[in-house]
Structure formats: C-alpha cells, structure tokens
Amino acid sequence: MNHFFTGIMLIGLLSGSNNAIYQTGTASFYANKFEGRKTASGEIFRQDSLTAAHKSLPFGTKLKVTNLSNDSVVFVRVNDRIGNSSRVIDLSLKAAQKLNFVNKGLTKVTLEKI
C-alpha cells in the first residue's frame, strides 16, 4: 500500500512539470548594431543581458534554451520580437556565448518554458 501512494505521488510530480519542450529550431544572436536600441517591449537592448526575441511568446516569458550540438544551456527572458524569420529565437551575445555558438552564427536549439 505504501508503494502505491509513493507511485501515485511520483506520477503527479512528473506529470506536473511545466518544463516540456515548447519548440525546436534554429537560433541566432543579435548583431552589435542593435546595442542600446529599444526592443519591442520598450526595454533598451543590451548584448550583456540574458534576453531573447521570439515570434509570439509574451514579453517576460522565461525560457531554458539548450544547444543541441553541445548540450550547453542558458536561461533567458523574452523582451523582443523576431520578424518574418525561419529562426525560432534570437539571443543576446551573452546568451550565445553561454551556448558556445558565436563562431558558427546559428545553431539548433530546444526551447522550454520555465
């Protein structure tokens, strides 16, 4: 009987996780010319912050971004929009550095809402 309740609790904990993969696709990072400009949310863009642009997620959404080529991870906050693009996310330079893809320019990632 004790194992039954432990199993039920474990299933509840596992199924209650909101960190499911939201999206998979290509990531890039902002060019330096955007430093100091206003984002779509009204914030000033800074390359040294951990922020991102996404097509539709609400401003303030926090994401776990995983680089699929090297399994590195960064946590970012959405504060801007991507226009008509095949990319799923544009990252600040600091976020791209943490994911180790600056020299490549683009990388395949997964996005998880946190």
For the regions a protein language model found, what residue spans apply to each?
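Secreted/periplasmic proteins
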Residues: N2-I114
